[in-house]
Every structure is written in structure tokens, then in C-alpha cells.
């Protein structure tokens, strides 16, 4: 029998209040130690027995800020990694950095005032800026408990080892006949001054105008067209109407004259014209939108270059030359009105093709004729639509987003960008548009600094020029799987690790990172890149809308990490179903900290009795212990199944029903008197149940569970090395379920009775319990526990239909 003095002495060793900051900083440093890396977190190349689990984690763009979206997937990645290690897998958990691209260039160009024309200095400063940003983001990730294998699997897309893989993959695609240089209309962002891929643009609703303009007919009369782009008048090559439109049937084939520019164009009939839009007559310009491109190709129309790289008008005989697009629109309206060609202007909202992906640009894009490098993508649409079905999507509905994107593809992938900070495209070209690849042994290289493999073009003899453009950043990040699994560098490792087990990412980059990785890996390896794709939803602001600085609803995960703890934040982020959007509120985090404080208190209460002690299973378990073990078995099995299905929400929710409501509020109270008496059944059961509980919770809340495991057990250097609990030996008995149900009912009923009669819980009372015969017989088996737990002098029983408690004098 333990004395109160002995218990109090032990309790002094366990702080009363859970201090997340102190505990978390301690364990984060321990996890980073060489010993823990070697024994816990290292991917063991030499291990030929354990199953392998490879996680393809997102390499975030190095902006310097770890926002809540980053915190979410970091938590998911770390949780999966820890669970799979507990499950016995040899886990490869990498972390890369998507380092190159326009945002960094703009920071260096405008904040540091470094001109990009000074290429060497500019690139040097881009790398320095990138490394500063990585340092900040890495520190934030570690503060959230994230533990990838920094030692060997941290990569940067600008580094030579990674760049070599990027360039080799491009040479391989060239050998397959999939890369070519050609001239034609491309998506162009005048603000960013670079070409874009189809995946980087999208439609945004913006305020606009619909101008109704008179076009005189050469033979007399007029046709009124409606356009949202009157500034493109000088580039108009034809007028189009629907061939079945009764208003214009007689005009098809006639000649219209462009006002102000006196240019003759033909009126054509085409089914793509919307009769209901505007007047049903439109101008075909080069180029106002994707439909103009289709018409130009279909009818072999001439082209006029009207807009330059900076979004200024040219080739209008001085009428609009030098004006920005918006300025030119206003000016042309004034001129048309002045000359009597303007019928009317309507203000309306319409969808404008804009630079939307991975950019805060959001500017309207234009179509400029440029010489660019393309990867042939469209020819693979059918194969992609078949092969994507081999990947399992979590949740399953996310597969349709990828399918829809593949079906919507209309353009090959333009991979060249008119920027500086990026992966050099390993090619030279001649004026006949012959593309010459670099030698593989020269990789990685910059063709602007390296001699070409030939003096002149081997196909036509013309001089060779280096490709000065850099690669689209999605070229960089689309080879993460190929890089990590050693496709080009380690065939033995590749066979062991490919395809990756799971890809983690958000919904916002399905049509970019997911699609490009899927496409490139399929073409290069002949296989899908990963077996599973886990796609998380968005973390919204507290008001339930998308986080935005302009709205003032942006929540930084580190703002209150010291106050509430990383584990509380992780519990909050994972208390939502994968794929769903959800609001993040600090009030919810506060609630999760209360849950962890409850866990801490339960550990402290248990410590004097089970701390660092071993207990053999007794031959006869107390009925209450049998009940809790049965509940425990279900909790463990249900949690493991939930983890396997990435249903972290289910694990978090079960902590409330199992730990809080059953273990803390019921079981611990019921066994206190037996703990004091050092009852082996109670000690064994509590020790087993609590260890398993910490193991199950560890992947989500690693700091507090590692600390409590170390205090209560400490058999191994990390709780991860314990492996998952095995509960198959626990027998299941439906009668024990009945016992548990009646215990909960009885304790709740008697506590309510005391509260209603304003009797403090520690004060003893006499009670009459009323209920069916089965209930009375069951409760009598644990009467002593009920009496000692609820401070009862005497219990009198009376049969009745309804279970209730009455106060006896």
C-alpha cells in the first residue's frame, strides 16, 4: 500500500502544468541529434527486410513565410512518416525547396535594386536571398515538430545535383522526339514579361466594357460588331458571324472596312460565333483570345503584331503606339466616338484570361507570337486519361479534377521563360528552328557559358545560338520522384523505392505539380510516379473565407505556437477530413491544448504508481479492467485503420470519446483506490493502456507523447521504436460491454444526484439504485468500486424499469 507521502514525493517529479514550449524545444533538438537520426529517422539503404514507404513531399517556394497551408501539409507529412515508422516501414521522408522563379527575381530586382542585366551578380543575390528564406522556413517547420531526413534528403532545385537531373530528363524527352522549338502565339504576361504555360493562366472576373462599333461595308451599308478589345482594331483580320444568323446571312463573303485604319477584311461565317453575344458579329484579331488563334489557323489569316513584351501598343501608324493597353482602349474609344463609329458602350463584368497560377500577379495575359521551346503534351491525352486511374486518390473525388484538366488541354507545354533565375535549358538552336541538345557528360550546364557540341548546325549548317531562356519552374519540381528514387543515379535504389508510396499536395496545384509530375514520370519511366495521391483542402481564415492580407484574416502558425504548442496546432489541423476546406481558429487550438493538459494530468496521476515499472499480466483481471481493455482494443484497431486510410480526423475525434470521456473521466476515477492498494490488475491495465495511448497519439502530437513516454516508460530512446500496439490477445466479451455501459450510467446518475442536492462530491451519502434485474446484478459485481469512487456509505437496490438513483437519509 503506497502512502500519501510517497505519492506526493513522486508527484513533485512531474510538473503540474504542461509547458508546451519547454517540452517542444527540448525534443526538437533531440530529434535533430545524430543518434536519433541514425536510429529513428534515417532511411536505411542497407535494410533489405523492412517494407519501404516513400513520401513525395511538396518543395515549397522559398518565400520566407511559412503560412498555414504549409503548416497543414508539413503536419500531414510528419504524421504519416511517424506512423509508418511505428508500423515497421523503412521511411524515406525528404524535404526539398522550390527555389527558382519570378517572385525571387522581383525581390532581388526591386528590393535589393540589382539589375537583372548584371546576370552574374543578379544570380548570386537570388541564391543568397533564397538561402535566407530557406533558413526562416526550415526553422518554422522544425518548430512545428517536422522531422524529415534533413541530413541526406534535403534538396534545392537550383543545386547542381538536382539541376543535372532536370537537364538530363529534358535531354531524354528530346531523344523521344518530344521537345521542339517553334514560333507561334503563346500566353504572355506583360507585367512579368515572360511566356506562360496553359496551367499558369485562368479566368478571373473583372470589370470591362463591350464596345459596339460600326464597320462600313465596301459595297455600302454597315455591320455593327461588339468587342471587349477595341484597342485591337488595327490587328483585325476578319469579321465573323454565325452562318445560321438570319441577320447576316447575306453579308457572308462581303468586305468590311476597319474604322480609323481603312483596312479591308472579309466577313466569314463560323459556327463558333455566339449569336446572342453583343450583336452576333465579332472581329477576329491577332490575337485577342484563344478563339482568335483557332480562327487564324483555320482560315490562314494574316497576323499583325500589335502588342510588345511590356504590354505597349505598336504598329498603329502612330495612332496608339507606345500606349499601355488600358490607355489605348480609352484612346481608341475617344477616336471612334469622335469619328462617329461608336454606337454605344456597355459596362459589364466578364471573365478575363489572367496570370493566376503560383503568382500574385493576376494581370490579364496577351497572346504574342514568340519563338519558344515546347514539350509535346497533347499527343499523350488518351494515355494519361487511362493511366491516372492506376493511382489511388484520397479523397477519391480529387481524381476528377485531374481528369477534367487533362481533358481540357489545348496547348502543348511551353517550357521556356524569359527570366534569369531558373534552370538553363540545355539546348542551342539555329535560325531554321533546329534544336541541338547538350552532351550528357557536360551536365549540368548553362549554354550561354558552354561551347555547343558542334561548330554549326549539323542539320543545315547555320550558326548555333544558345537558348537564353530558362525552364518553367514546373520543369524543376516535376522530377521530384525521379530525383528522390534515383532513376538516373542508382538503379538498385530505384527498384526499391519507385513508384513513391504517396504524393502529398493541395488542390491548388493539381493541374500543375501533380499533372506535370504524372506526365513527365510516365513518359520517362513508363510508370505512374506514385501509388497514392493525398490531396488536402485549404486552411481558411477564422471567418471561413480564403486567407488574404487584404481581408486581414491571415493566421500565421507561429504567432501563438509558444503559448499553445505545436502539438495543439497539429491536433487542430488534423481535426478535419482530408480534402475539405476548414477555418482555423485559435479558440479551437486552445481547446486542443486543454485536451493535452488533460493527458498530462492523467500521466501525472499515474506516474507514482506505474512510472518506470514493469507489470506481468495477472491471471484474473478485475471486471473493470477487462472492460477498459476491451474498449482499448477497439480504440487501437480503429485508430490504426484510420491512420492507414489517412483519416486523421477519426483519430483526433476518438481521443475525446476514448481518452477524455472513458479513460480520464471514468476509468482513472474507478481504479484510484486499487492503485493505492497496488492492485496488480489495475497497475498492469493502466500501464498497458497508457503506453498504447501515447503510441497511437504520437504521430499527431509527437512532443508531449515522447516526453510522457520517456517519463513513464523510457524503455527505448524514442517511442517510435516501440512499434504499434498489438491488442490481439485481449478477449472480447459482450457481457463486459454491458458492464461498462451500466458503470457509466451509474456514475453519471449519482454525480447528477449529488449536484442536484448540492452535496459536494467528497461527502458520503446513502443511495438507492433503481433498475432492471440485469442492471442490479451487474452493478453488484463492482459495488465496492462504485462505493469507493463516489463516496457512498451504503447502496440499496430496487427493481424497476428505469435506471435512476435516489438519496437515502
From Swiss-Prot:
> Where is ATP bound in this sequence?
549
Molecular function terms, GO-annotated: aminoacyl-tRNA deacylase activity; ATP binding; valine-tRNA ligase activity
Q: Is this entry keyworded Protein biosynthesis?
A: yes
Q: Which locations, inside or outside the cell, does it occupy?
A: Cytoplasm
Organism of provenance: Sulfurisphaera tokodaii (strain DSM 16993 / JCM 10545 / NBRC 100140 / 7)
Question: Motif ('HIGH' region) spans which residues?
Answer: 60-70
Extract the Pfam families matched here.
Anticodon_1, tRNA-synt_1
Gene Ontology biological process terms from the UniProt entry: valyl-tRNA aminoacylation
User: Which PANTHER family does the record associate with it?
Assistant: VALINE--TRNA LIGASE, CHLOROPLASTIC_MITOCHONDRIAL 2 (PTHR11946:SF93), VALYL-TRNA SYNTHETASES (PTHR11946)
Protein name per its UniProtKB record: Valine--tRNA ligase
Major location, coarse class?
Answer: cytoplasm
